[in-house]
Every structure is written in C-alpha cells, then in structure tokens.
Amino acid sequence: MTRDVTAILAAKTVRTFSYGFLGIVLPLHLSDLGLGPAGVGGAVTLMLLGSAVLTWAVRRPAERYGARATLVGLAGLSVIAALLLLATREPWLVVLAAMLGNVAVGTGETGPFLTMEQVVVARAVGAERRTWILSLYNLIGYASAALGALLVGIAVGWQALFIVFLATAVLQALAYRLLPAAIAGPARSATDRALPSGPLIRRMAALFALDSFGGGFVLQSLVAYFLHTRFAVEGSTLGVAFAVAQVLTAISLVLAVPLASRFGLLPTMVVSHLVSNVVLVAIAAAPTAAIAIGLLWIRHLLSQIDVPTRQAYVMAVVEDREREAAASTTNLARTLAQAVSPAVTGWVMQAVALSAPFVLGGGLKMLYDVLLYTTFKDVELRDDAH
C-alpha cells in the first residue's frame, strides 16, 4: 500500500471516529440548548450548507496547489471548530462550528474531505484495485465511527467529547502532512477548461442529488432524534444502536468488492440500494423501538454496498484530468440536495407524522435507483474497472 493511501486511511480513521459521536451528540446538544424539532432540522441544514460551500471551494485550490495543502487547510478548520464547540453554549455558534468543521451529520460523508481523498486514492492505485481500496477506505470510516458512537454512552459529558474532536482534528492534519507536496492532476490551460465528460458528470450529479435529497430525510442525527422522541430511547442506548449499525455498514462495504467483481459496478449499486430502501420505508410502521432499531440494522447491512462502487464508477467514467471536477461536482450536488431536506424533515415531523420522513426519503431513493440504471446502463467505462 502506498504512502499516499496510508495517509488518507489514517486521516479517515481519526476523522470518522469523531463523526461517530458528533452525529448523535450535536442534535441532542442543540435540543438541550433550547431548539425544537424544526430548529434542529434547520441547524442540520445549515451544517450541510457549510459542507457544500467547502466542497465547492476546494476544487480550484486542489487543482493549483495539490491535495496536501488543501486537506491540511480543511483539517485546520476542524481544529477551529472544536475549539469553538468547547468555548460556547450559544446554539448559533455551535452550528457555525459544525459548519466550519464539516461535521458529518449522517453515517457517511459528502463533503470536501471525501472529494479530495477519493481523487488521491484514484490516482494512487490502478483501476483493478480501486474498488477494493475504496471499500477499505469506507470500511475503516464506518468501523471507526462505530467506535466513536460508543463514546456517547460512556462519556462524562459533551465537553469531553469535544476535546476528543479537537485531538482527532490535530491528528488528521498531521496525517495529511505525510502526503507528497503536490498531488494534482494534469495541468489545464485557460483555453482547456471544457470537460469532455461534462454532460455525463452533470447527469450523474443530478441523479446523485436526488438520492442525497432522499437521504437527507433520514440522516443519522434525525434518526437519532426520531428514536429519542417517539420511543424515549436514551443517549447511551442510541450510542450502542448506532455502533452496531456502523459495524453492519462495514460488513456491507466488504460485500461490495465480490459483488462488483461478479455483477459489475452499476448493477451492484442499483440492486443493493433498492432493497435497502424498501427496508427503510418499513421503519415508519415499526410499533416498538426494538423493531425500529432491528429494521435500521437490516438497512445498514445493505445500504452502503453502493458507496465504494459509486465512487469507483465516477472515477472510471471520466478522464484523469476531469477527476477533481467530477468528484467536486457530484459531491457538491449531493451535499446541496441533502442540505434542503433536514429543514423540511423538521416541519414534516411536526405537521404530518414523526415517521413520515422514512416514507418520503425511501420513496425518493427508490426512484433514484430506477433512473440511475435506465440512464447509465449503456455507458462504457474509460478504464479497466469492473
């Protein structure tokens, strides 16, 4: 394994460890500070908008200065965010800190770190190993997040967890320092800005946005809020439940490699994702916390098989010089779309039903599966990825 990949995996480990507890703690912390369902939903939307802005902003610096400088800068913002969380009890400053630190409020990432890291991995390994490395990348992230989620049940208070966040942000910056001084794609002149795969990238971005919009209704933070509000599930129990969910998600990432090798990237993405969202809709009808959590676990066992396959697919259908643009555009679309739905979710929970977001989110995500397959089933890969 190359030094580039090792550094990226180390950074992913410490970052997602903190995301594992922050995704649970922040909505509960904001609730303790006086925000209701609509306020928490709006706060999550602002966090995602902050991630979208950072995702949009990193493309040009990455193309000009390389991955190391860009990623170290992003890690520096996480350090500032952790310090701000430690220093304030004002809800709007807590939200600002989460925006600056690109704090993930779901079980996965769609922001600037993912954008840059998947490009580094794509350039560091050949197409024949790309799906495997990206599966390992995501596997490490979910396993680390599972361990982080367990801290919610044993931590003496939110402040202790924010100190852990600060420490992991510093370690993340140090890991990025191990990257070569400049990892960037082939230089493009001002007259060579047109992307041959531009229409393809835009179609992918539009469909990924639909999927992400649906996913925004059922982010981990909002699912935790749902379980806490409807079934009175305590924070310690939520920590264990989501830790198990992260482990099951990690297993789904392991399954992605043999399935993609046998059936291809696109069929693997679509079928696994479709089945997982049928289970998601079923959570809305769960009569007890145990059944709801059980269905959540089944979904997590299937839901992320499409993640490394999707990342490998995006890198495989564009030219090397288009990879920053493809990663940035598709991840930006996902983040922006996901930013809209949490605010709607808060309103839907109050005005319609607490469980309605599961039906809305699952239905939209199933529509995405059908459209994705019909749109891209005849598109050929540019390299030898499978």
Please report, for each region that a protein language model flagged, where it lies by residue.
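Helix-loop boundary and gating motifs at the non-cytosolic
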Residues: 1-49, 200-208, 212-243
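Hydrophobic core of transmembrane alpha-helices in multi-pass small-molecule transporters
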Residues: 13, 81, 91-112, 291-305
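Residue-level signature of mid-helix packing/kink "hotspots" within the transmembrane helices
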Residues: 48-56, 145-146, 246-254, 335-339
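Helix-to-loop junctions at the C-terminal end of transmembrane segments
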Residues: 53-66, 252-265, 349-350
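Conserved MFS/SLC helix-loop-helix module at the cytosolic interface between two early adjacent transmembrane helices
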Residues: 53-89
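Structural signature of the two symmetry-related core transmembrane helices
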Residues: 69-84, 267-282, 362
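Glycine-rich segments within core transmembrane alpha-helices of 12-TM secondary carriers
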Residues: 132-153, 333-341
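C-terminal membrane-cytosol helix-exit motif in multi-pass small-molecule transporters
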Residues: 148, 166-186, 368-376
